[in-house]
Structure formats: structure tokens, C-alpha cells
Amino acid sequence: EAGVSQADIKYASIYDSFTITVVMQIEDLGFCAKGDGGKFVSDGNLIAGVGKFPINTDGGGLCNNHPMNRGGMTKVIEAVRQLRGEANSVVQIPNCDIALAHGTGGGLGTRHGSATLIFERE
């Protein structure tokens, strides 16, 4: 375990194959209660600069056309950009010192898996 709580995480890159995927994952990761994900999102909590918990400041897979086999590396790249202060200035999270990258995958009807990485800037 990383020894951090959800409140410590300033930014998250979350796999977003579909809109509902984000809602399910923020609930499963404990950033809001089960069943409250839709309201959490519609209240603007995920928007950089104004929300409590900005995610996918690179636009995520839905914005980047979800290219085939883009994998979790794009999640790691944006998390590291945030930690280094190198994200686009419009979406840079001030004083971002802990970031999360989370992904799920697998073929439909076959094996599925997920991974969560937590990064800290020192």
C-alpha cells in the first residue's frame, strides 16, 4: 500500500473507454460513495481549475479518439506531467505532489484486469 488516502491525491488519470467507466472507477477507488458518481461528476468535481478532483487533464481516451492499444502509458505520462508542472498551463494542477494512474483492460468476455499506480513528487 502507498500509505496515502484519497484526500492526498491531487490528480488522477483514469481509463475512460466509456463515460460510465469513469463514474464506476471513481466510485470503486473511493473518491465518492457508491451510487454518487453521477452527481459527483455533474457537480463539476472533475474539471481542472474548479473541481475538487480533476482527472484526465490530457482529455483522456474519449477526447483523444481512444486509439487502439493506447494502453495505460498515456495515463502515466499525464500523471508525470502534472507532478513535474509540465502539463498544459490551462489544466496544470497547482502544487500537484501526489498523482494516481488507473487502468482496466481485457477482451470482452475474457480476462479482465486493472492496475493502480500512485506517484509522489519529492
Residue map of PLM features:
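Claisen-condensing/thiolase-fold acyl-transfer catalytic domains that form or cleave C-C bonds
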Residues: 1-122
